């Protein structure tokens, strides 16, 4: 497979970007996208709403776990299987469907995902046996999970690297807010309707309303189908009602020069990206941060409802709210900072290379312009995670637990935004597939640690467990140091093609 590995090499990607910039620098180019700021805002709203149901579907289930354990007359460890299974399928599904979206368009895959999600939610609300509940949760995850990766693909379609971070941050912030407030919503539904079935009826209704909205206004953005947005899609599934309105109709100029060539459907595409050494070292810490956040949410509901705190379901739900807000704010701040820092480093690069011919310039250090910002979320995760475990262990005041969950959720959301943006930058033609790698790593790690959480707590206690998780986070964070070092060395040791030719001639002489 050496040929496939070369195809997805980061260094090759960066060099190709440099050559592309040189070739087109003197040409009059069509705009990167015809989507204006209002169009992008509408897309952010639609994608955020769709992704919200994907994000909320996992944590909304947590407050119901004690109730479901009693209802199905089973044990907490057996009940956790449904949580782990959900996370596994949430990770696997986007690696397949994101390729479908890259090949056949974003719109039909998103709409199909919502339909499957709604149908499964209705089925779960009528379930009376545990094995069927666990099975249907797998289908629920597989149905709606792809929208996270596809949303990042849309950002790659309509945003340049200079402003891509802002859109990824805004969309992922609104989506991950569902992950933050899911516990509160689940607790409110159980308390208000006195049945766990209300959770899935709520999800079905919310998903159905979102489907109608998306069906009307979600425009196709895939550059393989609509180019920069100026080409009218041929397939009816890719056509939104929106494109027939005067505001959008005037932008349809059928500029086929902006159309990307269609590639074959490659089911292994995401895995070819996933197992690149530098990509894997970036995915591992971001996935570990998300996994730590997920298990902290699980412990939060279990411990606060236990005899130690004896909180009601609704009171536990309220504790979830602050970290949900922190998650949303964190992603928005990350998006702003990514845009600002990219422009700062790009301007610095342009000034340094002002007197260097285009052909002799090293490629812009795109990796450093993204990953340098990870130092803040890394520090916040270490502080928040270690404090969370020991505060629960010794039954400290609830405010200390809330503050620690704020640090954890803020850190996880910022890390997700940074790593997702970087992968979309590196693989813009496979933006959906690259973003699905983030999803795959975060969900599989979350499934792994959720599955073994009870056993680790039994052996080490809460404080020891979260201290161990802190250490694992620190260990995986070393991967980012390696990636940054490699990127900087590549920049410092760059030899231009002209210099190579001169050296070669000198040796011949």
From Swiss-Prot:
GO terms for biological process: lipid homeostasis; membrane raft assembly; transmembrane transport. Its main location: membrane. It is a multi-pass membrane protein. The keyword Cell membrane applies. Residues 1-41, 97-106, 156-169, 219-278, 334-370, 419-432, 477-509 are cytoplasmic. PROSITE patterns: MFS (PS50850). The keyword Cell membrane applies. Gene3D superfamilies: MFS general substrate transporter like domains. Disruption phenotype: Leads to defects in biofilm architecture. GO terms for cellular component: membrane raft; plasma membrane. InterPro entries: MFS, MFS_dom, MFS_trans_sf. Residues 63-75, 130-132, 191-197, 300-312, 392-397, 454-455 are extracellular. One of its GO terms (molecular function) is transmembrane transporter activity. It is found in: Cell membrane. Keywords: Cell membrane, Membrane, Transmembrane, Transmembrane helix, Transport, Virulence. Induction: Expression is repressed by caspofungin and during chlamydospore formation. Also regulated during white-opaque switch, and by NRG1, TUP1 and HAP43. MFS antiporter that does not display functional linkage as drug transporter and performs functions that significantly affect biofilm development and virulence. No substrate for transport has been identified yet, but plays an important role in the growth in the host. Belongs to the major facilitator superfamily. CAR1 family. This is MFS antiporter QDR1. It comes from Candida albicans (strain SC5314 / ATCC MYA-2876) (Yeast).
């Amino acid at each position: 497979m050496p040929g496939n590995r070369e195809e997805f090499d980061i260094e090759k990607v960066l060099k190709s970007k440099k050559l592309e910039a040189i070739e087109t620098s003197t040409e009059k180019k069509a705009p990167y996208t015809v989507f204006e700021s209002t169009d992008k805002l509408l897309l952010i709203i639609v994608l955020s709403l769709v992704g919200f149901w994907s994000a909320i579907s996992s944590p909304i289930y947590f407050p119901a776990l004690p109730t479901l354990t009693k209802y199905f007359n089973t044990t907490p460890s057996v009940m956790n299987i449904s949580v782990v299974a959900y996370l596994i399928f949430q990770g696997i599904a986007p690696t397949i469907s994101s390729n479908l979206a890259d090949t056949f368009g974003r719109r039909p895959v998103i709409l199909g995902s919502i339909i499957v999600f709604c149908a499964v939610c209705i089925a779960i609300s009528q379930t009376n046996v545990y094995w069927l509940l666990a099975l249907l949760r797998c289908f629920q995850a597989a149905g709606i999970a792809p929208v996270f990766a596809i949303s990042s693909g849309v950002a790659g379609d309509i945003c340049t690297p200079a402003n891509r971070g802002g859109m990824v941050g805004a969309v992922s912030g609104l989506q991950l807010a569902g992950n933050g407030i899911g516990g509160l919503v689940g607790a409110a539904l159980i308390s208000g309707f006195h049945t766990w079935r209300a959770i899935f009826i709520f999800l079905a209704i919310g998903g159905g309303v979102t489907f109608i909205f998306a069906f009307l206004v979600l425009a196709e953005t895939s550059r393989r189908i609509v180019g920069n947005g100026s080409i009218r899609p041929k397939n009816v599934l890719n056509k939104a009602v929106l494109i027939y309105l005067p505001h959008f109709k005037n932008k349809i100029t059928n500029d086929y020069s902006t159309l990307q060539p269609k590639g074959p459907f490659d089911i292994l595409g995401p895995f070819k990206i996933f197992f690149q050494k530098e990509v894997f070292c970036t995915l591992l810490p971001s996935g570990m941060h998300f996994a730590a956040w997920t298990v902290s949410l699980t412990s939060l509901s279990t411990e606060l409802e236990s005899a130690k705190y004896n909180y009601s379901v609704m009171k536990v739900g309220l504790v979830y709210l602050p970290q949900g807000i922190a998650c949303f704010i964190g992603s928005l701040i990350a998006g702003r900072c990514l845009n600002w820092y990219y422009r700062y480093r790009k301007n610095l690069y342009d000034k340094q290379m002002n007197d260097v011919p285009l052909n002799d310039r090293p490629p812009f250090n795109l990796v450093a312009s993204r990953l340098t910002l990870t130092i803040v979320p890394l520090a916040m995760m270490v502080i928040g995670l270690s404090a969370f475990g020991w505060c629960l262990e010794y039954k400290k005041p609830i405010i200390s637990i809330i503050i620690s969950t704020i640090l954890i959720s803020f850190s996880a959301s910022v890390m997700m935004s940074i790593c997702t943006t970087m992968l979309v930058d590196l693989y813009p033609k496979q933006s959906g597939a690259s973003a699905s790698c983030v999803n795959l790593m975060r969900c599989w790690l979350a499934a792994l640690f959720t599955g073994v959480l009870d056993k680790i707590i039994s052996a080490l206690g809460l404080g020891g467990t979260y201290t161990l998780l802190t250490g694992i986070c620190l260990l995986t964070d070393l991967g980012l140091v390696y990636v940054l070092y490699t990127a900087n060395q590549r920049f410092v040791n760059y030899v231009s093609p002209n210099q190579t030719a001169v050296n070669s001639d000198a040796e011949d002489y």
